[in-house]
Amino acid sequence: MTATTDRGLPGAPCWVSLLTGDLPAAQEFYGAVMGWSFRPGTLGEDFSVALMDGKPVAGIGNVARSMGVAVSWTSYFAVEDADTVAARIRERGATVAVGPLSVGHGRAALAADPAGAVFGFWEGETLREWSIGHRGAPAWLELRTRDAFASAIFYGEVFEWATGRPDRCEVRYEDDAVMVRGQGHTVACLRGGGIEAAPDPQIRPRWHVYFCVDDVEKAVEAALAAGGTVAAAPHDSWVGREASLRDCEGGLFTVTGARG
């Protein structure tokens, strides 16, 4: 991490990272589509940090093959004690797949919730200037899952959401979705079927990362030209214009014209 760090709000998203199998190809793709530049990461030659206007946006790690996982964008949540969080995850029938491991000046782990959605958590300092919807960071994080209410209970218990503590995230139920708020703004959304509806078996649970672009259609054209594919064509959603894309190795992400 850089000198501008703090411990982060426990339970709130603190970073996103692409697990890729080809770092140079990933940098070329996202440079073309998102206009990012890159600098070496602090974890070795297999890692880099994506920058927008000189500000950190996301991490890229050339570790998908060595870890035996799919190429994917992963959302990380800040925690005070990685071992405690790992125990809570296991106690609730979910999986801690990797870690917690010492990484740089902190500890990281990868897990999957009971529905199979992969997420990470991080114990250590976080970038102070990185916050959902601000300064080039992702505009939005959304868990698409079969049962949003059940997922809210799981994550709420694991990350201590909705405990009434001022140093924790709060939860609101709006328009059949679970909105997670921290320090005065929305940091994540959990969306599935209706809150009281039966789970939707057609949904493949996953955390989706939304990146803001000036022009969704141009981003789609750039992705296709760079060897990516379109998972969902440009359309108007509840947050604005958006499209879902896969990079040249299949990593799924969404571009949106909405500013957080």
Segments from the language model and where they lie:
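Vicinal oxygen chelate
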Residues: 1-8, 12-21, 49, 64-88, 94-143, 165-183, 191-193, ...
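Active-site-adjacent scaffolding segments
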Residues: 41-132
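Short amphipathic beta-strand/extended segments with alternating polar/hydrophobic composition
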Residues: 58-61, 188-192
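Core segments of cupin and vicinal oxygen chelate
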Residues: 2-3, 7-10, 14-55, 91, ...
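Active-site/binding-pocket entry motifs
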Residues: 56, 66, 186-187, 196
